[in-house]
């Protein structure tokens, strides 16, 4: 997209608000050649100018320093904008402008245009002058922000262009920019933008009586001799057309060998028989393709249309219906002679209303037209089926019979084909479309011509998503319909364009997903030529919140190879002008594609012809097989033939490039098994419910859709409206998420299967018919009525699971009379889903069972006979959510308030007075039919409902009639710049001027561009033309537009103000509704007539006031901080003493100053009748107050109904108030105090003693247990006695018997586990003094232990050393540790 601003070339000078004037340097009636730049210069100029202007405007500095008031003047550092301009730098248009100069510019401003803006320009020339508009730059949000161009001075004049999106030079630097022409001498341009996103806007040059496009630089602008005020182009040689923009006889047509140039006739090349092309440069046949624009006769603008349909019959292209700006001269039926290039108008006597978005299909001499939107009938989508007979030129209508439980959908934006099935039945197949009731339909509809019946068949294969504005072609070879693109509702409540390609096999009713094109679009065309589907044009805009440059109108040219499942991009038409469009039609004759009409800001009436290469031109086998793109050829017996004409004998098929399996990322987009496996991308369905590449590893995969189990979740997700969701009993509509969800499987119960709209159960028990029926009845069901193919397939699959026994179950089919069989649900047996076996039904049987033979079928049997099995059926138990009725569809809501009552679900178009689904706004108004839409607030639907001139001129179809008082009073009327208008027919185009509605002779003044200077709403005269002198009639405001405080009403346009009725509890009320702003907290109601009893407020505001009832001994806090409390200046309280022998204390404080009054009363009517209360306290401007009321003084005992009233007033918002009433003794009772104190102290002491005693007991118990464990452990240790000989000097102890021999021995050895180490324990004699005795206080002996290695000792030694150790117990078993 182009991001630059609008360039003003030359030396522009401001001419009027909203226009910039530039005088051309050359003559010729204001031509523009002197300042035209090439495309690259435009882009560069736009970029620099945009950056410079944006750098100024975006800075929030005083305008005196920056000088950045774009359309205004700087006064006191503030921009004062010229009329029609707004913004802090006056940079956005917002209003109406009148341009009277012979040429000039108009623009929306220097930067991106404003959100939610409406701007209108009236260019006024003189009657019947030719006015030309050239769009040097145009960039708006496609399909949402539009510029409307009318050939006249109001929106009731003929509409000639609706511009939207990006319109800039695209292919060549010298490419001509679009030009729009009006012939009335006036042009009204109205621009509307919504609140989504904005772009750089537009720069439009206009000129009056100038040559078209300045003769495109290929001619001279000349003044007409007969009419001096008119000019025309004298074209240079080899250029023709009104603007000299059509080249002819290039290279002199290759004369004389190839052809010659016809200079006297139509000025084109006349080729010799062996040459073709616009310049006779291609052979016949040719290996190259080319485009041409034939000379059409007559070339009437009324032929132009979009969203029409065309079919080919012989040499005639029949065009029926379509959208046009003006239906008054619209021809419903046209035919175009493809040989002579002549249009003819069909003149049937009677027929259908004009429509667009319908379908056409040809069968023999009849053209079948179905559905579409009837623009002249409130925009309703119809389900009418009309037949046009070509021979008799007459219409007839058909009313088909809908079979079964099907539905006939009224749709638009669908497609249709008629073919003969293998069953010899001729069927018209209607594909997808949008229904105003059921949303985007994904169903196939069949119309059987011979039986005049309608059917919605069940399809197999992939689960596809239907939409609006797709294209489809039927291929006789594959017996399939190929469907591409469209505008669809997508998951997650999203919607947009798609590039999907589906194949529908008409005989097997199977869907397959093919390779997508990579270029999303809708309202394009598609034809089938030589095995290739050619896609041309369409709307490719798919932006949401940010533009990425996608164009509304495309000239993209794509080719799909059916045999190889490959897409190719073909070159765009290389013609002398743009051919971008959408909403066109295309047919094929003699291998050439003819494109007609469409929309590209204007309604197109031209014919484009595409001549593809001819297979016969290829002489080589390899060249033949590799021909393309856009053509498919086969080699047959040494010559090349087209894909369709070749027979099956001796044919060498074309080569296809090898296909590789898709990546996992590509396969992840398929969320169900059927779509994953019924496509050509090479995917497989893995056991963990995920679609992955066929080359990826998977433990258990499904590669054929016939093995898939259809999940209701995937079917329900494709249903885009509550109505369509409710038709499928397996689905339910979630109102909060606004999506269709599958019903849970447990709705049937354990042992049952949820199939379609029923629960089925197969049992193998052997019963007769009556007992089988009783069995099902006990399960709250009945014998099954198998009326759908899904139910039959399920039962057959269940029967096959019984491998150990033969199951032939009873079904709910019995003989009603001698020739009639019926199901148990009273539906007739149609012999379609199930059939009788050969020889059946026999005369002896009155009940039927299902026999599983080589071919499954029914057999008749006596009802008393036994059968092996039965099939039960019961209805689905629907949850509460599904029981909720759907809301009224948007298309059935007839008022703005009803349409916008449910948030963003619906959108109201005020100009067409239609309500549409939010996800279908684009397709409901594909050609900008809606001038303005609303989703919340509703404006008056007619001009008469607008009360002020400012409101009136905001609507492009209204004008203001100012009354003679010149005080701002008047009335708003539909009108034009010349005066008011009135409606004489049903459509707004049937408006005529009626100046009597605002008679000038009676001093009424008509205002269309700007309001009269004095706008005092009839309540004051003006001084200095625009200043209200003194507002009267209880009004105030700069324009006396508001009521004075204390009054309400709508004083605009002479309205009255009424005093507020607030029961004395408010001084002001809402200015318009009169709802009182009550000043006392707790009083509510429109007239302050109620107390807020739900929040403890009591009283009667009609006779007094309201009080908050306080509880004694509680503190209450009132935070008046919310916006709803802004008007509160008072709050009242009441309190009743609870004890008659205690004083009543009051405490009140607040965050702001307040006035306080306290009264008391014993009467029951106090608070409502003055004089009943006695004043106690009256304080002003305080923040805190405390007091005590004596029970003796006020005699609480004798006055049990005594009530204290507290009035807090005159405070400011916001405020926080705390108040409390309490009753307690004033003199402390010492006896009671000490009794209470000692009671508490002794209780606490007792508790402490008990806790201490419990603690001591627990401690003693734990100590005893610990000692016991220690004694047990000590008692379990090993022990022994040992003799010790002590020597003191040389003496021997007396009691030793015998001498000591050998070395000293240990007193103990404790071997470790493994007997490789031990702990040795010995006695040691400590050093002694000279006396041989140890020092005083010390022992002479000590015990020492050491770890020793005993692995090298002899066994005998070890035995000796350990012989003294006895009673050894609990030796450790852990290696390397001692005991």
UniProtKB/Swiss-Prot annotation:
Residues 53-1230 are extracellular. Kelch repeats lie at residues 316-365, 367-415, 427-475, 480-531, 533-591, 592-638. GO terms for biological process: G protein-coupled receptor signaling pathway. Residues 1014-1059, 1060-1108 form the Laminin EGF-like domain. One of its GO terms (molecular function) is carbohydrate binding. GO terms for cellular component: membrane. Residues 614-657, 666-709, 715-760, 889-939, 942-1012 form the PSI domain. Glycans are attached at residues 76, 174, 198, 380, 763, 778, 898, 1157. CDD domains: CLECT_attractin_like (cd03597), CUB (cd00041), EGF_Lam (cd00055). This is Attractin-like protein 1. It comes from Homo sapiens (Human). InterPro entries: Attractin-like_CTLD (IPR034011), Beta-prop_ATRN-MKLN-like (IPR056737), C-type_lectin-like (IPR001304), C-type_lectin-like/link_sf (IPR016186), CTDL_fold (IPR016187), CUB_dom (IPR000859), EGF-like_dom (IPR000742), GBD_ATRN (IPR056732). PANTHER family: ATTRACTIN-LIKE PROTEIN 1, LEUCINE-ZIPPER-LIKE TRANSCRIPTIONAL REGULATOR 1. May play a role in melanocortin signaling pathways that regulate energy homeostasis. It is a single-pass type I membrane protein. Residues 53-91, 207-245 form the EGF-like domain. Residues 755-873 form the C-type lectin domain. Coiled coil: none annotated. The keyword Repeat applies. It holds the Pfam family EGF_LMN_ATRN.
């Amino acid at each position: 997209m182009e991001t630059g601003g609008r360039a003003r070339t030359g030396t522009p000078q401001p001419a009027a608000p909203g226009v910039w004037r530039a005088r051309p340097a050359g003559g010729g009636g204001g031509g523009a050649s002197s300042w035209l730049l090439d495309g690259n210069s435009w882009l560069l100029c736009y970029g620099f100018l945009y950056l410079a202007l944006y750098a100024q405007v975006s800075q929030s500095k005083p305008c005196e320093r920056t000088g950045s008031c774009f359309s205004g003047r700087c006064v006191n550092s503030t921009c004062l904008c010229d009329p029609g301009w707004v913004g802090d730098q006056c940079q956005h248009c917002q209003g109406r402008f009148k341009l009277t100069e012979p040429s000039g510019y108009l623009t929306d401003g220097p930067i991106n245009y404003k959100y939610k803006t409406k701007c209108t320009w009236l260019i006024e020339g003189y009657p019947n002058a030719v006015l030309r508009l050239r769009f040097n730059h145009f960039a708006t949000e496609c399909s949402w922000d539009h510029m409307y161009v009318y050939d006249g001075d109001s929106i009731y004049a003929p509409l000639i262009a609706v511009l939207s999106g990006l319109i800039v030079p695209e292919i060549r630097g010298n490419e001509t920019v679009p030009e729009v022409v009006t012939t009335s001498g006036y042009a009204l341009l109205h621009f509307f933008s919504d609140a989504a996103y904005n772009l750089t806007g537009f720069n439009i040059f206009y000129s009056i009586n100038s040559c078209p496009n300045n003769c495109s630089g290929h001619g001279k602008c000349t003044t007409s001799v007969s009419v001096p005020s008119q000019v025309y182009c004298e074209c240079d040689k080899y250029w023709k057309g009104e603007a000299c923009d059509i080249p002819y006889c290039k290279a002199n047509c290759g004369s004389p060998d190839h052809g010659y140039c016809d200079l006297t006739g139509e000025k084109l090349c006349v080729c010799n028989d062996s040459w073709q092309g616009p310049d006779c440069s291609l052979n016949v046949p040719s290996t190259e393709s080319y485009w041409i624009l034939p000379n059409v006769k007559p070339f009437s603008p009324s032929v132009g249309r979009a969203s029409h349909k065309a079919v080919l019959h012989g040499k005639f292209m029949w065009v029926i219906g379509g959208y046009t700006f003006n239906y008054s001269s619209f021809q419903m039926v046209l035919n175009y002679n493809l040989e002579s290039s002549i249009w003819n108008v069909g003149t049937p006597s009677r027929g259908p209303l004009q429509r667009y978005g319908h379908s056409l299909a040809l069968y023999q001499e009849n053209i079948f037209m179905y559905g579409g939107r009837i623009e002249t009938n409130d925009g309703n989508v119809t389900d009418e089926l009309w037949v046009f007979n070509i021979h008799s030129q007459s219409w007839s209508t058909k009313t088909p019979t809908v079979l079964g439980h099907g539905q006939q959908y009224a749709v638009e934006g669908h497609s249709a084909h008629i073919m003969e099935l293998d069953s010899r039945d001729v069927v018209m197949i209607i594909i997808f479309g949008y229904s105003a009731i059921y949303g985007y339909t994904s169903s196939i509809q069949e119309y059987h011509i011979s039986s005049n019946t309608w059917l919605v068949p069940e399809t197999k294969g992939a689960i596809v998503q239907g939409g609006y504005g797709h294209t489809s072609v039927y291929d006789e070879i594959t017996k399939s319909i190929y469907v591409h693109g469209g505008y669809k509702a997508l998951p997650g409540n999203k919607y947009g364009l798609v590039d999907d390609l589906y194949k529908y096999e008409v005989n097997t009713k199977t869907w397959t997903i093919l390779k997508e094109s990579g270029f999303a679009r809708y309202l394009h065309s598609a034809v089938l030529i030589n095995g290739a589907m050619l896609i041309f044009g369409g709307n490719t805009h798919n932006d949401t919140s940010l533009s990425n440059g996608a164009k509304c109108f495309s000239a993209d040219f794509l080719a799909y190879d059916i045999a190889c499942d490959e897409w190719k991009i073909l070159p765009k038409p290389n013609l002398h002008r743009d051919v971008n469009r959408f909403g066109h039609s295309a047919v094929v004759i003699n291998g050439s594609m003819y494109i007609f009409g469409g929309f590209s800001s204007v309604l197109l009436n031209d014919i484009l012809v595409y001549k593809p290469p001819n297979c016969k031109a290829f002489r080589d086998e390899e060249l033949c097989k590799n021909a393309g793109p856009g053509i498919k050829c086969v080699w047959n017996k040494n010559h090349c033939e087209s894909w369709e004409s070749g027979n099956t004998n001796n044919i060498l098929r074309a080569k296809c490039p090898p296909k590789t399996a898709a990546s996992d990322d590509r396969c992840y987009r398929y969320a169900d098994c059927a779509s994953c496996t019924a496509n050509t991308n090479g995917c497989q369905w893995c056991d963990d419910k995920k679609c992955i590449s066929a080359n990826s590893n998977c433990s258990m995969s499904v590669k054929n859709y016939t093995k898939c189990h259809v999940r209701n979740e995937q079917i329900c997700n494709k249903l885009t409206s509550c109505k369509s969701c409710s038709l499928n009993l397996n689905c339910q509509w979630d109102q909060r998420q606004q999506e269709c969800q599958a019903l849970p499987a447990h709705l049937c119960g354990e042992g049952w299967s949820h199939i379609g709209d029923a629960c089925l159960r197969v049992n193998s028990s052997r019963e007769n018919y009556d007992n089988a029926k009783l069995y099902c009845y006990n399960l709250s069901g009945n014998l099954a009525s198998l009326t759908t193919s899904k139910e039959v397939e399920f039962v057959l699959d269940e029967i096959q699971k019984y491998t150990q026994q033969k199951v032939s179950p009873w079904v709910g089919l019995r003989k009603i009379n001698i020739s009639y069989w019926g199901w148990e649900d009273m539906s007739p047996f149609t012999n379609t889903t199930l059939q009788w076996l050969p020889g059946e039904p026999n005369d002896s049987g009155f009940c039927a069972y299902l026999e599983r033979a080589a071919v499954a079928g029914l057999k008749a049997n006596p009802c008393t006979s036994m059968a092996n099995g039965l099939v039960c059926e019961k209805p689905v138990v629907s949850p509460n959510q599904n029981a909720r009725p759907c809301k009224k569809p948007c298309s059935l809501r007839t008022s703005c308030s009803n349409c916008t009552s449910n948030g963003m679900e619906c959108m109201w178009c005020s100009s067409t007075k239609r309500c549409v689904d939010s996800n279908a706004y684009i397709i409901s108004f594909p050609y900008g039919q809606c001038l303005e839409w609303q989703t919340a607030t509703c404006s008056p639907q007619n001009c008469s409902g607008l009360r002020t001139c400012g409101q009136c001129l905001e609507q492009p179809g209204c004008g203001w009639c100012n009354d003679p008082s010149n005080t701002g009073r008047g009335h708003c009327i539909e009108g034009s710049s010349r005066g008011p208008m009135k409606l004489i027919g049903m459509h707004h185009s049937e408006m005529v001027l009626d100046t009597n509605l605002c008679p000038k002779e009676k001093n009424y003044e008509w205002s269309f561009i700007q309001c009269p200077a004095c706008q005092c709403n009839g309540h004051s005269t003006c001084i200095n033309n625009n200043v209200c002198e003194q507002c009267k009639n209880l009004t105030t405001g700069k324009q006396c537009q508001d009521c004075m405080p204390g009054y309400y009403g709508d004083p605009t346009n002479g309205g009255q103000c009424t005093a507020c009725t607030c029961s004395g509890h408010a001084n002001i009320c809402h200015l318009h509704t009169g709802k009182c702003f009550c000043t006392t907290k707790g009083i509510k109601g429109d007239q302050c007539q109620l107390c807020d009893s739900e929040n403890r407020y009591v009283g009667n505001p009609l006779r007094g006031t309201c009080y908050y009832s306080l509880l004694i001994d509680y503190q209450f806090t009132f935070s008046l901080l919310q916006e709803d409390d802004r008007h509160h200046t008072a709050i009242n309280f009441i309190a009743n003493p609870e004890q008659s022998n205690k004083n009543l204390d009051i405490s009140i404080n607040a965050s702001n100053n307040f006035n306080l009054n306290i009264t008391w009363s014993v009467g029951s009517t106090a608070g409502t009748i003055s004089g009943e209360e006695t004043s106690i306290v009256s304080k002003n401007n305080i923040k805190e107050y405390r007091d005590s009321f004596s029970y003796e003084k006020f005699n609480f005992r004798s006055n049990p109904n005594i009530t204290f009233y507290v009035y807090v007033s005159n405070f400011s918002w916001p405020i926080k108030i705390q108040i409390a009433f309490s009753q307690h003794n004033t003199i402390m009772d010492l006896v009671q105090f000490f009794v209470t104190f000692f009671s508490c102290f002794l209780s606490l002491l007792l508790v402490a003693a008990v806790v201490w005693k419990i603690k001591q007991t627990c401690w003693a118990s734990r100590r005893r247990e610990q000692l016991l464990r220690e004694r047990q452990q000590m008692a379990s240790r090993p022990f022994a006695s040992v003799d010790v000989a002590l020597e003191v000097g040389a003496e021997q102890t007396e009691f030793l018997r015998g001498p000591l021999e050998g070395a000293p021995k240990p007193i103990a050895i404790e071997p470790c586990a493994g007997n490789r180490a031990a702990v040795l324990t010995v006695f040691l004699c400590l050093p002694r003094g000279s006396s041989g005795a140890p020092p005083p206080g010390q022992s002479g002996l000590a015990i020492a232990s050491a770890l020793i290695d005993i692995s090298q000792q002899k066994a005998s030694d070890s035995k000796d050393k350990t012989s003294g150790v006895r009673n050894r117990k609990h030796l450790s078993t852990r290696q390397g540790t001692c005991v």
